[in-house]
Structures are given as structure tokens and as C-alpha cells.
Regions:
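Alpha-helical membrane segments of multi-pass proteins
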Residues: 1-185
Length: 185
């Protein structure tokens, strides 16, 4: 995405670190968590590559259509898997947002808005609202619950890759990253 270099590199670092943690979560003994972690790792690394500042690297013209194909496939997979759990609907929205941003970058790789008008396009605004709500809800879910003193012992017995609060923090950071990327579209 085309924005200032320093925040762009911070976003790259955040998304790459999140993607790396999600790869480690793929070693979980829980199959559903492994699958979700794989989807989230793809999203984290994809966001990291897309967030590289344009001043540092200008990708060839074929990159954005390739992104659209990869994340279009991820969206179709999320749609198929959403039959078994509503969490995959968020993966569907995230993959669709990546397809949308890749399409915007394909049509105008050097400008933020390819739509010619002033203001925020309707789809961008809808995605911004969705991810803002997702970030707020995810942040609230990370707040400690009163009476959860016994959960500290349970958490120490779990493998660090299987801890749900770390997975929630991972999803929260990717939601924040998606918000930042959508603001530059």
C-alpha cells in the first residue's frame, strides 16, 4: 500500500510477526486450530508483503492480479469451510478485502484512490466499518474476566501455541493491520 515509509515498515513487521506466530500455531494438537492458524498465517504474510512501502519496492504489474487469484482462492476456501463454523466468515471477509485491495492496486498502482471522486468508496467504507467493529470486539474479548483466577494455572499447563488469548491477540493485530491498510486505499 502506498503510505509513509515508517508506518509501512511497522505494519510489515506486525503482520510478518503475526504470520510467523500463526505458523507456529499450526503445530497445535487441535485440528480446527491448525486450520484456522494456516488461514491466518496466509493472511499475515500476505498483508506484510502488501504493506511494503512503495518507496522501498515497486512490484511488477503481475503481482496484484496474482494476489487477487491467491486471496480469491482463500475466500472460496473460507466460504466452503464456513459451513462448519462462523469464525470462517471472518476469514472470508478478510480474504475478500485482500482481493479488493489487490484490484485497487491493479487499476492504480501509484495512487491511493483509483475512483476519481472525492471521499471514501462505498466498499472501502463498509470494510473499514467491519474491521473497526471487529477490532473493538476482539479487544474486549482480551480483557480479563473477573473470577478467572484459576485460569492462570490452566494456561500454564497449555502449550504456548494452544493458548486462546494469544490467538485472539493475533487476530486483533491482523484486524488493526487491515484497518491501517484500508485507510490507504
Amino acid at each position: 500500500m502506498h503510505g509513509p515509509a515508517s508506518p509501512g515498515w511497522l505494519l510489515v513487521a506486525l503482520c510478518a510477526a503475526t504470520g510467523a506466530y500463526c505458523l507456529l500455531r499450526m503445530r497445535s494438537s487441535d485440528e480446527t486450530q491448525r486450520r484456522a492458524a494456516g488461514d491466518e498465517a496466509l493472511m499475515g504474510f500476505g498483508m506484510a508483503v502488501m504493506a511494503v512501502p512503495g518507496s522501498a519496492f515497486t512490484p511488477p504489474a503481475w503481482v496484484w492480479p496474482a494476489y487477487a487469484v491467491v486471496f480469491g482462492g482463500a475466500a472460496l476456501r473460507a466460504l466452503w469451510v464456513a459451513r462448519s463454523g462462523t469464525h470462517h466468515l471472518h476469514h472470508l471477509v478478510g480474504a475478500a478485502a485482500m482481493v479488493y485491495m489487490a484490484a485497487v492496486m491493479t487499476s492504480s498502482p501509484t495512487a491511493g484512490h483509483a475512483h476519481g471522486g472525492s471521499g471514501v468508496p462505498l466498499l472501502t467504507g463498509g470494510l473499514l466499518l467491519y474491521f473497526a467493529a471487529y477490532v473493538l470486539v476482539s479487544g474486549v474479548r482480551l480483557l480479563p474476566v473477573a473470577g478467572a483466577a484459576g485460569s492462570a494455572a490452566t494456561a500454564s499447563a497449555q502449550a504456548w501455541g494452544d493458548r486462546p488469548e494469544l490467538a485472539r491477540a493475533c487476530r486483533l493485530s491482523m484486524g488493526i493491520g487491515m484497518l491501517a491498510m484500508l485507510l490507504t486505499v
